[in-house]
Amino acid sequence: RKNTVNVEDELEARKKSGKGFFGDNVLALCSKADIVFMGLHGSNGEDGKIQAAFELMGIKYTGTDYISSAISMSKELTKKVLVPDGIPMPKGVALKRGHKIEYVPYPCVVKPCCGGSSVGVSIVANDAEFKEALTEAFSYEDNILVEEYIKGREFSVGVLDGKALPVIEIE
């Protein structure tokens, strides 16, 4: 018999119940390990919260530190870090729930500020699609980005010990 748990639902239930972010004895168990392998994906594994808890407790772990994780999970913060250093980024605006945008250049991309794996992302070509995209993006969080659409191919480059790994095309 195989039991599966929706982690997002479990974390939300823990938050509402006041039980805390981690399951019973998780931090105590992790503190006994030589190193914790971070194999987590999504907002609760990549946003820096778990990494910060580990650092506060002196638990060694693999992967990115908590500040870098938090910045990387926020597309808005990432832009604020990269643009001043001359890294080209799509032009766009951050939009909070309830605020209006004066002008929308089509085509554009509408997406939640945080998250990954293209969750909540829409490519929009007109006003009707824009309205639907806003509803979709705001269903994930209260802060979204509206950016220019840049047609092209998508690539990913991992970095290990300061050295670029091979380029991988995302299809």
Per-region residue spans from a language model:
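Short beta-strand-to-turn element immediately C-terminal to the catalytic PLP-Schiff-base lysine
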Residues: 83, 95, 121-126, 159-161
